[in-house]
């Protein structure tokens, strides 16, 4: 059991005051290890809120550098960070918010050669990536490793998210394969309202904290979608498919696949 310092009691007092969280729940948060894949639009708010909450160890994977066009929605990066690796910029802000958080940075692409080795070090994975191939890679790696994860995607004025736990519906239960290259526009082609990234990212952060504290109902076997134009939120039931190629009773995928990177659903 963690012997809380006065500083920690004060820092996390609003969590500790919550009957459903308390000291025990905060201790679980502080012992948690979370991997955030992507330090862009979704990874930014996820990382900031998890750091503020006191997650003990946060890993960040991203091979990109900060671009001026990122600053409209990637709130973890500042103007001074343009040209800096996103993982370095994100680590600086996380440490500024909460110096007690251990940060692991992976300035590299997540692919079939490293995904399982990186993911195995963490208790929960957050998908904040910008393309379908990596989303499928994260899904498959997490299913193979038995790791829970939160999926997120944004485009224009819309967002979607769900949470996977072992035995529940996975990404392939909904979408069997990535769409053909060019079938779905990117945010650089179609645009995205900056605040949408914050809306969805904070939902993913909340799901992560709920997972570790055991509070409430997770978004398992259901896909949450929202349209910011109308502020309509919908929850669509999703079934675990016994015939799923990765999590079904007789899976046909036995290794990780690097799909063509041209098919994107969003840009960081």
What would you call each of these model-derived segments?
Residues 1-268:
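Adenine nucleotide-associated cytosolic modules
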